[in-house]
Every structure is written in C-alpha cells, then in structure tokens.
Amino acid sequence: MARILSSLKARERVTRIVAPAYLFAAVAGLFASPASARDLEIPERRQFHIDSSVNPCDDFYKFACNATIKGFSLPETKSVYNFGADDAKEKLFIARTKLLEAVVRGQATRTPRMAQVARHYQSCVDTDRRAQSEREAVKRALALMAKITTREQMQALLAANILSGSGDFSVVHAESSYSFENPIISDLSLSTDFIALGGRDEYSDKGTLSNYAFILAKFFKAIGAPGAPETLADDVVEIERRVGLKEPESFDLQKRQMLPKEVSREWALKALPNLKLQTLLARLPSNIKIKMPVPEQMKALDTVLKEAPLEALKALYLYQHLKDSVSLGYPSFAAEWAQYKANTFSDPKEPTGKEKCATDVIELFASELDAEMIDTLYPGFRREPVTEIVERVRAAMVKSLKRNKWLSPSARDEAARKIETARLQLVRPEEERHWDYLPVTELSASDYARNLRAIKAAKSKKAVGELSGARDLSKWYSNPLEFNASYSPQENSFFLPQGILIPPMYDPADPEWMNYAGIGATIGHELGHAIDVNGSKYDHTGRLRQWMSNADLAKFNALNQRLVDQFDKIGHDGKNTLAENSADLTGLLFAYEAAFPNSSGTPKQKREFFLQYARGWCEVRDPKGVKEFLSSDPHSLGQARTNEMLKHVGAFAEAFKCKAGDKLVLPEKSRLRIW
C-alpha cells in the first residue's frame, strides 16, 4: 500500500496546474481573478490531492476527494458544489457576463441576435427604468382585469394565451413532445403551469399554506389590487391547493413526464370544456396527438375554472402574470418575498443586482451567447480525439452486448443495434441552423417588463413552429458550452457538448486512460441509458416498443433489483435512482474496458484511472439539502456514485491491492454486471 500511495503522490506533483493551451487562450486574463461576485476562487485547473490517512479500499471517495473538500467553503449561493461541473459553470458564467457587458459597451460584435440580448440586459440593469417598467406592467394588468366581467371572458383569455403572441399568462403549459411512433413528429404535451409550492405534501400542510397566503396578501396590497388582499390571497392559495393536491410525488411525476398518457382530441375537448382547448388546437395540425403527464390534474384545473369565483381567477392571473415584475418597482414587497423564500425553501441565496440580471439573461439567451464565444474560448479544438474515445467506448459496449448470455437472440441483436446506430451530437452544432436560438425579437433597452412578455411570445412562436412541422433531429436543444451530456431514447441520440470537454473530464494533454476515466465514463453512462430500465422501452429507431421478451424482462429486472437493494441499504431510494445507478455502473465498466483493452495497462495507470473517475464526483453539499435531494433526485450522492460502483469492479481491488474484508471488496459472485 505504501508503494501505491507513493506513486499516486508522484503523479499529483506532476499534474499540470494550468488549463490546456487551447482553452481560453484568446481571452487572456478572463479567469485570472476570482469570481468575486459569487465569492469563489476558481483555479484554472483544480488540483486533487489524495488523503493518505484513508484506506482507499474502505472509502475511495474520501481517499480521492477529502483533501479538496476540506479546504473548500460552500458559497451561500450554492446548496451543492461539484468541483468539476461547478468550476466549469462558474468560469462560463464569468465569460458570458463579460461578453454581455462588452456587447453593451460596443466592444464586441453587435449582430441582430446579440443586439436583442444586449438590450434586454440593459433593461434589467437600468434600475430606474426597470422600476418604472414594472409599475407600468402592473397598471396594464389591473386595467385588463377590470375589463373582465364574466367567467366566460376569463376562460377565453386564459385559453387565448396558450402559446400565444401576447406573452401573457395562461393556466396551461403547452410544448412539443416526441411522438412514440416517429421521432421526427411532434406531439402536443399539456400540463398545468402555476403550481408554486411543490406537490401534495406542501398543499396538505396548513402551516405552509398559511405562510404562503400571508406573503400573497402582501403582494396584492403592494400592487393595489381591488378587493381585500387577504381574501385574494386565500382565493389563490385555494386554487393552487385544489390543483396541487393532484400533483404526483416527484419520482412518479418524472416517470409520467417520460411516458405521458396519450389522450384523444375528442376526450380533451369533452373532459376539459372550461379550458377551451379548441382555441389552441385550431392553430395546430388537425392530426396532432395530445399527451398529458397528469390528466387528473388537468381535470382538477378544469373544475377550478368552472367553480372558482371570478375574482379568484383574476387574482390568480395577476399574481402569476406579475410575480416576475415586482422586484425594483415594489422594493418593500421584494424584500419580504426574498425573506419568505429564504425561510420556506432550502434553496441557496439568490444573486442580486447585475449578477441576477446576468443570470436571467444567460438563461434566456445561452445559445446566442455561446455561438459568439465558442471559437474564442476553444480555438483550434480538435473533434477527432473525442470522437475516437466515443467510438472505442461504443465498440466495447457492442462487443459485450453481442456476447451477452442472458438475453434472447433477438433482444441481444436489438440492444447491440441501439448502441451501434445511436446518433452522435459531439462538441458543437456543425451548421448554423442546428443552433437552438430564439427568434430575433424587437426588445427594448428600457422596458424590462415588456421584454419578458415579448420573449415569452417568441418562445410560443417557436413552439408552434415545432408543433407544425417535422422535427430536425440534428438540432441542438442544449447549449454547447454547458457542462453536461445527455441521451435521448426517443431519438436514440447522444449529446456530448464542448462545455464538458475540460478537466477533470477531458484534457488532450493528459494520458488517454485519464480521459477514459473522465469523459469515457460519461460517454458510457449516457449510452448506458439506451439500455437501462427506461431507455430499453424504446427501440433503435426511437419508437416505444417492447423488444425484450417477457423472459428477458424477468432476468433484467432481477439484475436491476440487486442494484435497488444495494442502494436501499445505504439510505438512497434504490428504485427511483435505478436508471442513473445502472448507467453509472455501465459507464465505469465500459470506460475501463475501452481504456485497457485485453487487460492491457500497468497497475499505476489503472490506479490513476480510478482516481480520475472518483474526481468527477467530488462535491460539497449543504447538509440541510441532503434529505430533499435523496427524496426527489434520480441521482445518488457523489460518495455513493464512487464507492458503490467500485465494489463491482474487480480491477479496482487488484489495482489497490485490496483484500477480503475491506469495505469496497465484494466476492466475485456478488459483483454485478448487467451488460
């Protein structure tokens, strides 16, 4: 063990501190100073030192991460900080903010796309004009509600606002969704759009509802809404309560959103007459199919529109339509609202001032900003080495699948075909039309509230276009500079953007086994979703189809149950984290096999591989948020994603000379390999 620790420390000493030369080369000094606005000091490349006081065979996560965790203080704007992901996110935030300010000052190219971004940012940071804009928005909304005198008028307004050019509030959220039969066809997905507190637990708690009503009364008093503020607040809370009680538990909701119920047009119009969906459907293709993740919630909403007092519906409209436009124009209420959220939710402290403006504008226009800066941040980046890693991991998976012993021949062929034919979206969009831009919109540099409506209207216009034509499978619906990767079962496509191709995930100057441990494991994880408990419901074309026999499914479920039981024992929800846990295991195993084909590689290289893998999960969490995370997130904690997976990798025990009885050593017969 002493020799192993010595070799690892030697590797630590030669690890490069600076980022690779290609990264951020053209923006000298961009990251030279700490991100003072967010109270973080971010090194150009974070070093991870081992904790030699920890036995790696008992807790490899602490062995790899402890030294880094001990020297880090979680900022108040974060509830969790993953060193790889959040270092990248913070650096990207700084770069995007600098670009925003440069465009505003005329120091960067002001294309029509960037001009709209700059104007919206200006409208946000100009505090006096923004305050006036917010007050004018309140006046317009109050005047509109004064004109509504009947329930039918209110229902008609809410119906007309669904995916409309007005950008005004509606009770229904409509968006395009993949067809179960053909991924290039879009279905219409409908859900509620105003449940603020969470789900049935929150809407069953009298104390939570009382506090919510108290702050809403403050809102109605602040904007000068007609009627008693307390009554209006109680009315809104009651509407939300009736609909919110139909909200499924978080994991159930996630499953329903993945496989939403399909309903007929006739059912939607007959069962939900007060939503007046014919207004929306008249603007869409007549053969469009409708999906509802939670149809019982839509029925509850329809009943509310029929039974709630007109003044209650008006109050709901005012609150939902104006809640994002009452910060600077109504500072006293804004302060009370911020305090209410801090007391009620476990969310970290929100940014303020220019940082909040930058955060909001970036969220709306990330693709526009990324398109302007990607070549500057990554000059000369080579796609070919990344493609090679993807193909080697893919080849390792296909090879293993074709040798699978428990699947029937037809299912084995389909599993391999899914991986072989998965479409790759790597690094960045290859054509301009594949970027996910908002339609260029006339925005004002001085009217923030109107801009919000115009942006929402532009999103609606874009959604109607997607619903009315064939889906472009080459479109990037995520931002290329985000630290992320994903797999879409409906398209059988894998997305690996530029933003994640940085240390500790990827560095072309690192030994290749280090890159396989980082980005290779991520590639295997995402491709593993193609054949996990959810992705396996779709075939290689993206159609919803059972391609495993019932006997196959029984064996598959038995293997998965072993992972469920394993994570249940450590305090996680094994069933609801199964898809992510199985993808973690798949990713680790196949990344290792791609890095060391035919058992090649030295023990030192293999130890470095496992260290680099663990670094991807090093994180600091606010203890107050752990319980909520475990009850709602489909992922496991970083420590579990490291230690629980390594138990199933015999090569790990060999590399670190672990012995029977060590906590991370399982008997060979107890090690799990699904694929």
Where are these regions (language model features)?
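N-terminal secretory signal peptides that target proteins for export/translocation
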Residues: 1-15
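Intrinsically disordered, low-complexity linker/terminal regions across diverse proteins
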Residues: 38, 236, 242, 274-275, ...
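Short, Gly/Pro- and small/polar-rich lid/capping loops
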Residues: 38-48
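Bacterial N-terminal signal peptides
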Residues: 18-29
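Hydrophobic/aromatic-rich, well-ordered segments within soluble, folded domains that form packed cores
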Residues: 49-70, 202-220, 588-590
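Active-site-surrounding "flap" and adjacent substrate/cofactor-binding loops of secreted or lumenal enzymes
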Residues: 41, 55-59, 63-129
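Boundary at the C-terminal end of the N-terminal hydrophobic targeting segment
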Residues: 32-37
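Noncatalytic, helix-rich "gating/capping" subdomain that lines the substrate-entry/channel surface
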Residues: 100-392
